[in-house]
Regions:
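Catalytic core of the metallo-beta-lactamase
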Residues: 1-50, 86-176
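Active-site metal-binding motif and surrounding structural segment of the metallo-beta-lactamase
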Residues: 35-78
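Short, hinge-like loop/turn segments at secondary-structure boundaries
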Residues: 45, 70-74, 94-98, 188-190
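Generic structural signal for helix capping and beta-alpha/helix-loop junctions
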Residues: 60, 85-87, 179
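Residue-level signal for the nucleotide or nucleotide-sugar donor/cofactor binding architecture
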Residues: 64, 148-149, 199
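Short, polar loop motifs at secondary-structure junctions
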Residues: 78-85
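Accessory terminal helices/loops
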Residues: 156-170, 174-235
Length: 235
């Protein structure tokens, strides 16, 4: 497997490049418009063909690079079915794997940060990796106070879906504001200050209710654009 973790500094967002060594097909999870050219350069340098861009959810802090990458490569935009995004080529559903060459990416419906959120599990010879988007971060999680988010729902999603994976499954988050790169399911289950360490759903709901976070600066632009797979920004 070919794997790259790519960072976008303005929104502290991670994009993940996954490639099949045998077929040379590739996918990008959560590409960002401002770094789409960088991602495309990496794909070309590695001799890969971009088959899919894959969203974890409709983002509020950046615009997806899906449309721009599709225009340049013919890739397909895979978006969670509950997003109801215009111009999507593939509706992501739990139980329907996304094949990237010989690699099998398993979608997990993990609402709570937003009501359309998905995580993705990739099983390989070296174990499992889970791309958690904003559902689970390193020592944290995404907010639950917009886009039909719900703290109790997020708690159940993480505990029932992500924490059900093996302890040694690697956790690759959608963001990290300290540029930490990777954790594990066992580590987050044991010590995540919001969701781990045996915290109850009521404790988690209280933690999230007390955050009082500011509105994302790009939300009014990003959400409408992402509901069109970035087409508005790509035109």
């Amino acid at each position: 497997m070919i794997f790259r973790q790519l960072f976008e500094p303005t929104s502290s967002a991670y994009t993940y490049l996954i490639g099949c060594e045998e077929t040379r097909e590739a996918a990008l999870i959560d590409p960002v418009l401002e770094t789409a050219e960088r991602d495309l350069a990496a794909i070309r340098e590695l001799g890969l063909t971009l088959k899919y861009t894959i969203e974890t959810h409709i983002h509020a802090d950046h615009v997806t690079g899906a449309a721009q990458l599709r225009d340049k490569t013919g890739s397909k935009a895979a978006v969670p079915e509950p997003s109801n995004a215009d111009h999507a080529d593939l509706a992501v559903r739990e139980g329907e794997a996304i094949m990237i060459g010989k690699l099998r990416l398993e979608p997990l419906f993990t609402p709570g940060h937003t009501d359309d959120h998905y995580a993705y599990v990739l099983h390989g010879a070296d174990g499992a990796r889970v791309f958690t988007g904003d559902a689970l971060m390193i020592d944290g999680c995404g907010r639950t106070d917009f886009q039909n988010g719900d703290a109790a729902t997020l708690y159940r999603s993480v505990h029932d879906k992500i924490f059900a994976l093996p302890d040694d499954a690697l956790v690759y988050p959608g963001h990290d504001y300290q540029q930490r790169r990777v954790s594990s399911v066992g580590q987050e289950r044991g010590r995540n200050p919001r969701l781990g360490g045996g915290k109850s759903v009521d404790e988690f709901v209280a933690i999230m209710a007390a955050l009082n976070l500011p509105r994302p600066k790009k939300m009014d632009v990003a959400v409408p654009a992402n509901l069109e797979c970035g087409e508005v920004q790509a035109d």
